């Protein structure tokens, strides 16, 4: 197959432009999804990994290395950034689409659950178009559709959890009046894995100390109902007077794209 991935994006967008009642705003939303997907595939997947490059074994170091690479790229320290122009369409598979929806997309600060839903619909429409153009066989289409549809509920749930946690922190994080203004005794930050969840509390672990649980962290039930054991939270925790609380929060990633560090065989990534 000589078709490139970029050509499949362009062909699909042109098809939408020439058919149906798609508005300029709708077309721009579809195009944005492909821009995000392109960023993930180029900078965060293993599709453009140079031979001989090694991947850090620690997941947090790995993500920090990726972010550093992006910063260097933005500053023009790389002469020839990779492109999807030469990437064959058949180089990707359902795993890339799953990791895009449940990891990379959730890193975007502006993304909410509705946008995750929209991105999913864009990908499914693109795959249907690819099948109609005979770029995909029936079995491959079905497998990719299953992967996307199985990923969607967890990706939306994680997006909701992240936004609720952010609002919770902005509103004071449920800190008791007697504790406000008092210094924290210690801090812990990084990618924390949800180890236990109850109706009012959760316990977290970090990959560098998987047997040491931190908690309980008291949270409203409306937040906890969107968290599952195995989810990973980019978080900063503070402890004062023996009470752990969330000080700062980043994305929440569903367990579907994270496994314990000791069980993970990290793919090579662009560094």
Give a label for each model feature:
Residues 172-200:
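Structural detector for short beta-strands of small beta-barrel domains
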Residues 195-217:
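OB-fold (S1/OB) nucleic-acid-binding surfaces
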Residues 1-5:
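Extreme N-terminal targeting and regulatory segments of eukaryotic proteins
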Residues 238-271:
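OB-fold/S1-family single-stranded nucleic acid-binding modules
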Residues 144-181:
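Surface-exposed beta-loop interaction hotspot
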Residues 7-155:
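N-terminal core-binding DNA-recognition domain of tyrosine recombinases/integrases
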Residues 189, 219-236:
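Short nucleic-acid-contacting surface segments enriched for D/E, G, S/T with interspersed K/R
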Residues 194, 204, 233-235, 246:
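Hydrophobic beta-strand residues in large extracellular and virion-surface proteins
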């Amino acid at each position: 197959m000589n078709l490139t991935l970029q050509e499949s994006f362009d062909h699909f967008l042109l098809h939408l432009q020439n058919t149906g009642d798609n508005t300029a705003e709708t077309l721009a939303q579809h195009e944005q999804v492909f821009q995000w997907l392109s960023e993930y595939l180029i900078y965060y997947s293993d599709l453009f990994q140079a031979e001989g490059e090694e991947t850090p074994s620690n997941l947090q170091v790995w993500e920090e290395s990726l972010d550093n690479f992006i910063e260097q790229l933005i500053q023009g320290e790389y002469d020839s950034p990779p492109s999807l122009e030469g990437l064959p369409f058949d180089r990707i598979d359902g795993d890339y689409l799953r990791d895009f929806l449940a990891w990379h997309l959730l890193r975007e600060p502006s993304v909410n659950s509705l946008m995750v839903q929209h991105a999913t619909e864009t990908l499914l429409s693109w795959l249907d178009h690819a099948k109609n153009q005979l770029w995909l066989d029936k079995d491959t289409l079905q497998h990719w559709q299953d992967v996307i549809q199985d990923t969607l509920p967890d990706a939306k749930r994680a997006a909701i959890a992240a936004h609720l946690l952010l609002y919770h922190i902005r509103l004071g994080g449920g800190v008791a009046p007697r504790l406000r203004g008092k210094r924290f005794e210690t801090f812990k930050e990084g990618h924390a894995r949800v180890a236990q969840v109850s109706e009012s509390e959760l316990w977290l672990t970090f990959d560098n100390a998987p047997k040491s649980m931190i908690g309980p962290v008291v949270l409203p039930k409306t937040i906890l109902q969107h968290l599952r054991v195995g989810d990973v939270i980019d978080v900063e925790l503070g402890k004062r007077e023996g009470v752990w609380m969330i000080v700062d929060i980043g994305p929440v990633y569903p367990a579907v794209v994270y496994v314990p560090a000791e069980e993970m065989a990290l793919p090579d990534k662009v560094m």
